[in-house]
Amino acid sequence: MKIKNYDGIIEHHKSVKSTNLMAIEKIQNNEDFDWLIADYQTDGRGRSSNVWDSPVGGLYATRVIKDNNLDYSHISQISILSSVIIAYTINKFIDGWNIKLKWPNDILIGGDKLCGILIQTLNHDNNFYIIIGFGINVK
């Protein structure tokens, strides 16, 4: 399913291998999209090729930014900004919980990992892409 909204194209899938992997494949195939969202990932990934457990009931998404004014030097800033924005958003829904950031890419609640963020980059057809994937396990 594709949804057209004010901020671009959002694709929702019931199951994917990995939203980041799907994003990379879509970029390489010159497909137009901004967000990929999945109910379940069969092969979710974290940093350093770690496995990210992605059970049904979580939120697994990837946002792609295409901006040739950005480069690899901006990745750490984008990582920090992504963590803060996601933690802030989670806090809006579950106010009162003790949410903490564990740099560079984890969000903890009550000492347990609630969310992981994986940022990747891709150069394709003379364009620079930043791929921001995150998984929120809510069960």
Which ranges hold each PLM region?
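Short, low-complexity Ser/Thr-rich regulatory SLiMs
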Residues: T121-N123
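Glycine- and Gly-Pro-enriched alpha-helical subdomains that act as flexible
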Residues: K102-W103, L108-I109, K113-L114, L118
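A short coil-to-beta-strand element that immediately follows conserved catalytic motifs
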Residues: D34, G96-K102
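Beta-strand scaffold of nucleotide-dependent catalytic cores
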Residues: I37, G116-L118, I131-I132
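Active-site glycine-centered loops adjacent to acidic/histidine catalytic or metal-binding residues
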Residues: G44, D106, G135
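Short, acidic (Asp/Glu-rich) active-site segment that either coordinates a divalent metal cofactor
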Residues: N126-K139
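N-terminal lobe of the biotin/lipoate ligase/transferase fold
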Residues: M1-K92
